């Protein structure tokens, strides 16, 4: 793959946003907004309708107004030096155009500037204005956990408004406000990232296969066409943005276990050698330099933020581990039947996977893969990423795990009626503990999840070339992070070598989980699992996890 084709993997709508709620497997993958807010301060001498940005300029939705007092000094950055009492319309429009490179924080559509204190599109600006101009009483029909993205933003007004408020949209922000230096730097980082994408896009091949695959509709197109021919709720995956829930998958457990394992595309014989796929490379040296220079640092920073926004906060985890154990909750879980514990674990895993889907959307280029490949990667990789995420919830010194809102001794979690189930649970905790002992940073955990999800040659995917390019990009960033933060573990064996060597274990545990689920369903056919869990781990659509 040449430089031009590689860029087609990246959309102009990246990076996306956080989503704290839960829904089902397809809509979340098309949500592409960012979680940061722009907190705004009231200033007494600013005209109505004028918003000061952090660099002393006045921006309105339609024109540029002169300020009545000079800004407190001047600021220089990627937008250039700005000072003095007045700014001409041409200069303000130029800066607004640069901000508009960043997608709408609410739904991921093309933004039109800063509205109500947040970078949004015209559609979300108008929605928020209407919600604030009259008394509204929105109701959510789906547990207040709907995904708000370009496809589904009009389906639930309640969740859309909550997301606007969570991002920091405010009527006060229309009139007054300044971004802090930290917020300004975030915006500048985003603009740099999208400019790097645009530079690569200018050189993109006109016959790229992605040109015909995904076209981003404008705000007006979506606003007028949302309810015409919408596919509805065909499956749990449909609420994450997927029509028809992906390709039919008909292999079964017996065929998976009977198939010989394909040769793994990794080598550890010489751990001083950087990872290279066995097939020819798809990035030339010049483009690798551009990626590392223009994108890699922003990728690390952005993925770390999205990782933090789709996981329990470290402060909360540490607080829970520092509290005395809640005896009543311990007794409650100890009194659970085998069946109750199975279903409770399925609920907890489903909630985690909902956030994993949110995170996957934020991996640059993931949303440019075909819909079928996105679904296949999630079906085959979501359980593996759950193991990685579990490592954050384990205290390896005390042998404890944060399970929901209670800290449990790990030894209490590995008791099972069937020795095979016990081996599964024990294997999961051992894998998670081994990751926790490496003391990865949040950035490294985020990149590691990207590597696990995008591991090349997963069975059934069609876009292996594109997936491999995305994998290489995450690998490059991960290598830089590990080299900067970790010394070799033993001899020339690095932390990265160790992490890559764990991925086959994740595959084995995924298969063991499917086997345990199969046995449980045979003995308890009437128990109902969460829809997303049933869809991802249905034995009617099992993937060959052992391939690749």
UniProtKB/Swiss-Prot annotation:
Region Disordered, residue ranges: 1-27, 198-228
Biased segments, Polar residues type = 211-222
Question: Zinc finger regions typed NR C4-type: which residues?
Answer: 104-124, 140-164
What does the entry list under GO cellular component? nucleus
Record SUPFAM superfamilies = Glucocorticoid receptor-like (DNA-binding domain), Nuclear receptor ligand-binding domain
Under the heading CDD domains, the entry gives: NR_DBD_ROR
Q: Which domain of life is it from?
A: Eukaryota
InterPro entries given in the database record: NHR-like_dom_sf, NR_DBD_ROR, Nucl_hrmn_rcpt_lig-bd, Nuclear_hrmn_rcpt, ThyrH_rcpt, Znf_hrmn_rcpt, Znf_NHR/GATA
Which family is this protein grouped under?
Answer: Belongs to the nuclear hormone receptor family. NR1 subfamily.
Name of the protein: Probable nuclear hormone receptor HR3
């Amino acid at each position: 793959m040449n430089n031009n084709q590689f860029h087609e993997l990246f959309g102009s709508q990246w990076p996306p946003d956080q989503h704290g709620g839960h829904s089902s497997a397809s809509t979340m993958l098309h949500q592409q907004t960012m979680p940061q807010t722009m907190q705004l301060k009231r200033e007494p001498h600013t005209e109505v309708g004028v918003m000061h940005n952090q660099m002393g300029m006045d921006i309105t939705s339609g024109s540029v107004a002169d300020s009545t007092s000079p800004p407190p000094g001047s600021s220089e950055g990627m937008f250039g030096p700005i000072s003095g009492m007045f700014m001409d319309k041409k200069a303000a429009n130029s800066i607004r155009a640069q901000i508009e490179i960043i997608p709408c924080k609410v739904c991921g559509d093309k933004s039109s500037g800063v509205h109500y204190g947040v970078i949004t599109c015209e559609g979300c600006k108008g929605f928020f204005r209407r919600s604030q101009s009259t008394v509204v009483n929105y109701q959510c029909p789906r547990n207040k956990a709907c995904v708000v993205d370009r496809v589904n933003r009009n389906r639930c007004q309640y969740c859309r408004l909550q997301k606007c408020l969570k991002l920091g949209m405010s009527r006060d922000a229309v009139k007054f406000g300044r971004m802090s230096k930290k917020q300004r730097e975030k915006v500048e980082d985003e603009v740099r990232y999208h400019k790097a994408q645009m530079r690569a896009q200018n050189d993109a091949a006109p016959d790229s296969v992605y040109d015909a695959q995904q076209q981003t509709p404008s705000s007006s197109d979506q606003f007028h066409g949302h309810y015409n021919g919408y596919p509805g709720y065909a499956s749990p995956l449909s609420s994450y943005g997927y029509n028809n829930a992906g390709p039919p998958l008909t292999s079964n457990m017996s065929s998976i276990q009977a198939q010989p394992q394909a040769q793994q595309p990794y080598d550890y014989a010489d751990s001083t050698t950087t990872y290279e796929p066995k097939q020819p490379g798809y990035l030339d040296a010049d483009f690798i330099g551009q990626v590392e220079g223009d994108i890699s640092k922003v990728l690390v920073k952005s993925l770390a933020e999205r990782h933090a926004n789709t996981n329990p906060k470290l402060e909360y985890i540490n607080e829970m581990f520092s509290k005395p154990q809640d005896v009543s909750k311990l007794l409650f879980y100890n009194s659970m039947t085998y069946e109750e514990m199975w279903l409770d674990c399925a609920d907890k895993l489903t909630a985690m996977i909902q956030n994993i889907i949110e995170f996957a959307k934020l991996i640059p280029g993931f949303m440019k893969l075909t819909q079928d490949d996105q679904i296949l990667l999630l079906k085959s990789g979501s359980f593996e990423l759950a193991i990685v995420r579990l490592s954050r919830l384990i205290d390896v010194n005390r042998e404890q795990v944060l399970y929901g809102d209670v800290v449990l001794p790990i030894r209490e979690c590995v008791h099972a009626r069937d020795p095979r189930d016990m081996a599964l649970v024990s294997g999961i905790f051992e894998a998670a503990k081994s990751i926790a002992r490496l003391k990865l940073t949040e950035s490294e955990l985020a990149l590691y999840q990207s590597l696990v999800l995008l591991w090349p040659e997963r069975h059934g995917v069609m876009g292996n070339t594109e997936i491999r390019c995305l994998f290489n990009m995450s690998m490059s960033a991960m290598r830089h992070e590990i080299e900067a933060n970790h010394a070799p573990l033993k001899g020339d064996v690095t932390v990265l070598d160790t992490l890559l060597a764990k991925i086959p274990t994740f595959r084995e545990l995924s298969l063991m989980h499917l086997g345990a689920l199969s046995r449980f369903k045979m003995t308890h056919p009437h128990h109902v699992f969460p829809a997303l869990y049933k869809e991802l781990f249905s034995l009617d659509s099992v993937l060959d996890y052992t391939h690749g």
